[in-house]
Amino acid sequence: MRFSKDYLLLGSILWLLLLSCTHKQERIVTPYGSVLDSVNVSEDFDLADIQTSGELIMATLTGPDTYYDYHGKSLGTQYLICQQFADSLGVRLRVDVCRDSSELAEKLRAGDVDLVAWAQPGNIEADPEKTDLAETLRQWNRPSRVEAAKQEETALLTVKKVRRRIFSPMLDKNKGIISNYDGYFQQYSRDVRWDWRLMAAQCYQESTFDPKAVSFAGAKGLMQIMPGTADHLGVPRDKLYDPETNIAAAAKLIKELQQAFSDIREQYERTNFVLASYNGGSHHIRDAMALASRDGKNPHHWAEVAPYVLKLATPHYYNDPIVKYGYMRGSETVDYVEKIRGRHASYQGVKSPHIGFHPSQPRKADKRKNKYDLKSD
């Protein structure tokens, strides 16, 4: 059965489900209340075609409520609901992130996407004669589905238990033994010209020295290598729990990041950016550097870039035209660099260094809210 392309509003989520249409003018309201020019849609497409293709294409805008990448895992309330919808159809979901609502409209014109999602309150509108579409709406327009997606995302971001064990941050301080893997750190740190204790500090931050650690996003092993990263590095996925293989893979990734930030000549500063990119992704860090540079800051000085890493969590900044990769949960990345630098200093037996940036005023310690429920450092 053929349908017109209608607006589907799922709780607080606007879906433009492009199920089919014949030369029809569509009136599109942007998330900001403005009306786009009418879009002439002339594609014929139905659910059977989507299922036959095996792929549902979602266009959206970057943001915490729509879609973003977090340590290699796709998140966002609207994304999670669209993923559920794709699962119900038995197809995979592909995401096309657009710059703005005008680009979303262009995707409609070109027939490049099957649905568009953004946050916009309103009502459901559907032609009652289109019984299949109406039934789809009845099945999916439940407030509980939106709430369930939000709860799923919250659970993923605040997960307390993963398959890991807690190891001491230092086995024998008197003898200078940090972990059971010091030999591997000493061997592979030479490839990246790091102090081996810095790599050990990073490893503790990643996995607490547990070779079997697994994050909610699927990162594995001592240095938390993602399966996709392993593929890129030519490392067999089934070897990621092997300590030496995992540390060697991390060294390869660190070396790639060093090359990616070779424009930062000062080694200490370059290492800060490498650590930040290992955690948050080099593209996001480059976005923060671009913002810092535009505002007259030194883009090669981490203390001047770190505030912009945090700003990438706010719409004013992640929607800025200079930003290419959108929303980022930057607080974890800034904290990541600080903690590794501090632990590295403790491994060296010196006072924790001041790298020039602290995201907040000192406050009473509370329970950690990162992907591992670690004991206090």
Regions found by a protein language model. Name each.
Residues 332-377:
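Low-complexity, Gly/Ser/Thr/Pro-rich intrinsically disordered linker/tail segments
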Residues 22-41, 76-88, 124-161, 175-179, ...:
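Extended ligand-binding regions for polar small-molecule ligands
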Residues 212-238, 246-256, 340:
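Substrate-binding/active-site groove segments that recognize
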Residues 85, 108-109, 137, 202, ...:
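Hydrophobic residues within well-ordered alpha-helices
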Residues 36-38, 160-209, 247, 262-264:
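Export/targeting segments at the very N-terminus of extracytoplasmic proteins
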Residues 18-20:
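C-terminal motif of bacterial Sec signal peptides marking the signal peptidase cleavage site
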Residues 124-125, 132-136, 272-346:
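Catalytic and substrate-binding regions of cell-wall glycan-acting enzymes that process beta-1,4-linked
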